[in-house]
């Protein structure tokens, strides 16, 4: 990664305070739920895309899984590596862009959670190509019939909070379901303009299909409240549970 991407700058800056966010406080319960959904064999290999400070990766490694954590932010990964050492577990940390990675091995499972790259658009990134590239790269990293769990922003919830004035002022684009906002400056860093993409369930079915994956379930996936319950209009995130059934139809990232 040569020039820093918008979200790389954002997460590098927020790495020191990331785990102060309230949504990071339910890791053990979230991993319990993931393992119920995934039915993995002991020691199975897991790829965590957009692993951040490694809270899910480390908890999975504590339970004996073979975990690789991939993230765009070197600062987040540095904190993840420190936390893994403190916990006495080994995780393979990889600094890479989720839209462009190719890995040398295949995994039993992949996770991409809590806005872990999917739909976090850099300036100029296409609102369809970005998530599709990530899905295809995840799919290529999976063994046949392997499972994937992603949480993505729920368009129904995003739509309900925006007005026509937001559209006129460029804060929300109803054609692409992209929300534009500015993160305030902190610790000498300038304000950072960010773009977040939300999704509707029908397009998720199509995107996953293009990536060679079949969607098994979609649940309400708001952080801190995961469970096998129907999606409603107020869920901040959708949890998608899918299985790899074919190689991706669409082109993925490059090295």
Where do the PLM segments sit?
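C-terminal lobe and adjacent flexible extensions of AdoMet/dcAdoMet transferase-like proteins
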Residues: 203, 207-255
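A short glycine-rich, Lys/Arg-flanked "PGG" loop and its adjoining helix->strand segment in the class I
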Residues: 129-144
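Class I SAM-dependent methyltransferase "Motif I" SAM/SAH-binding loop
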Residues: 50-54
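SAM-dependent methyltransferase
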Residues: 145-211
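A conserved beta-strand element that flanks and buttresses the S-adenosyl-L-methionine
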Residues: 111-113
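Class I SAM-dependent methyltransferase SAM/SAH-binding core
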Residues: 57-100
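Conserved class I S-adenosyl-L-methionine
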Residues: 1-44
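A short acidic, Gly/Pro-enriched loop at the edge of an enzyme's catalytic core
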Residues: 102-109
């Amino acid at each position: 990664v040569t020039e820093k991407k918008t979200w790389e700058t954002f997460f590098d800056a927020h790495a020191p305070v990331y785990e102060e966010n309230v949504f990071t406080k339910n890791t053990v319960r979230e991993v319990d739920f993931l393992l119920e959904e995934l039915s993995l064999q002991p020691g199975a290999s897991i790829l965590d895309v957009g692993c951040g400070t490694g809270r899910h990766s480390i908890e999975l490694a504590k339970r004996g899984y073979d975990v690789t954590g991939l993230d765009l932010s070197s600062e987040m990964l540095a904190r993840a590596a420190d936390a893994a050492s403190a916990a006495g577990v080994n995780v393979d940390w990889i600094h890479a862009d989720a839209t462009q990675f190719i890995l040398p091995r295949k995994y039993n499972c992949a996770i991409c959670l809590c806005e872990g790259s999917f739909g976090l658009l850099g300036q100029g990134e296409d609102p369809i190509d970005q998530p599709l590239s990530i899905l295809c790269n995840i799919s290529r990293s999976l063994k046949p019939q392997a499972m994937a769990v992603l949480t993505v922003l729920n368009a129904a919830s995003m739509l309900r909070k925006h007005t026509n004035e937001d559209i006129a002022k460029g804060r929300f684009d109803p054609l692409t379901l992209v929300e534009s906002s500015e993160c305030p400056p902190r610790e000498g860093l300038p304000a950072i303009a960010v773009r977040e993409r939300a999704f509707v369930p029908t397009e998720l079915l199509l995107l996953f299909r293009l990536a060679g994956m079949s969607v098994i379930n979609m649940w309400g996936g708001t952080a801190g409240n995961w469970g096998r319950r129907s999606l409603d209009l107020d869920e901040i995130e959708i949890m998608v549970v899918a299985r790899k059934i074919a190689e991706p139809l669409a082109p993925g990232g490059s090295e």
